């Protein structure tokens, strides 16, 4: 049995949700209604996020990148946590509902690209189009966009010990099949609603301390 860590990006690795930051800065007012319909699960994540990015003109690409480089903050303890998982030969994957044009630059030098799974964007037309290279498999019908539970099934064996780290509704399906969940913010609410056991965290120091204890118990 191996331990595998599947970690969200927006609002988890970063302190802020970068998609929401983009929408607040660059999207028209109607983005707020779409966002609320995603959070209430009236819209699927795939439908909602597609609609949000269709509100953003592609000629803002460089401004968006510069804005995120200046405002995105990596959560406290993440650098040390990555060093810890590498030293202990723990498999680590970023499974992000975020977009390639900002996830890759913000993680450059921290996580190898082949360990990052995110959505793709097309800037060739007037408005941003989102492509979905990691859709739901036959076991998930939630139209997740990037399906985290499907990726977990694809990247691991059933006898592996699965750890999910996340903060929002987009992490719920993955949390349902995890052996251990680290949750913060809205994911805590959803875990409690769905009777999913979780450990709250605010920094990756919290996660590392708990994971170190878990390794000692497992060994």
Curated annotation (Swiss-Prot):
InterPro entries: HAD-like_hydrolase_phosphatase, HAD-like_sf, HAD-SF_hydro_IB_MtnX, HAD_hydro_PyrdxlP_Pase-like, HAD_sf
GO molecular function: 2-hydroxy-3-keto-5-methylthiopentenyl-1-phosphate phosphatase activity
Classification via HAMAP family: Salvage_MtnX
GO BP terms in the entry: L-methionine salvage from methylthioadenosine
Protein name as catalogued: 2-hydroxy-3-keto-5-methylthiopentenyl-1-phosphate phosphatase
Disulphides: none
Recorded metabolic or biological pathway in which this protein acts: Amino-acid biosynthesis; L-methionine biosynthesis via salvage pathway; L-methionine from S-methyl-5-thio-alpha-D-ribose 1-phosphate: step 4/6
Keyword annotations: Amino-acid biosynthesis, Hydrolase, Methionine biosynthesis
Keyword DNA-binding: no
Domain of life: Bacteria
Organism: Bacillus cereus (strain 03BB102)
Gene from which this protein is expressed: mtnX
Family listed: Belongs to the HAD-like hydrolase superfamily. MtnX family.
Catalytic reaction annotation: 2-hydroxy-5-methylsulfanyl-3-oxopent-1-enyl phosphate + H2O = 1,2-dihydroxy-5-(methylsulfanyl)pent-1-en-3-one + phosphate
């Amino acid at each position: 049995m191996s331990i595998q860590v599947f970690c969200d990006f927006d609002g988890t690795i970063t302190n802020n949700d970068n998609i929401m930051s983009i929408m607040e800065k660059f999207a028209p007012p109607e983005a707020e209604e779409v966002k609320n319909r995603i959070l209430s699960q009236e819209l699927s994540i795939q439908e909602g996020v597609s609609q949000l990015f269709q509100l953003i003109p592609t000629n803002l690409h460089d401004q968006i990148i510069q804005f995120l480089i200046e405002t995105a903050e990596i959560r406290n303890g993440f650098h040390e946590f990555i060093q810890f998982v590498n030293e202990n030969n723990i498999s680590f994957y970023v499974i992000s509902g975020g977009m390639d044009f900002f996830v890759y630059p913000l993680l450059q030098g921290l996580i190898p690209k082949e360990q990052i799974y995110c959505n793709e964007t097309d800037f060739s037309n007037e408005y941003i189009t989102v492509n979905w290279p990691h859709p739901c498999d036959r076991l998930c019908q939630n139209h997740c966009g990037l399906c985290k539970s499907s990726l977990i099934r694809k990247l691991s064996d059933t006898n592996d010990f699965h750890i999910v780290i996340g903060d929002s509704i987009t992490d719920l399906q993955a949390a349902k099949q995890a052996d251990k969940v680290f949750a913060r913010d809205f994911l805590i609410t959803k875990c409690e609603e769905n009777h999913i056991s979780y450990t709250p965290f605010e920094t990756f120091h919290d996660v590392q301390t708990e994971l170190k204890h878990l390794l000692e118990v497992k060994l």
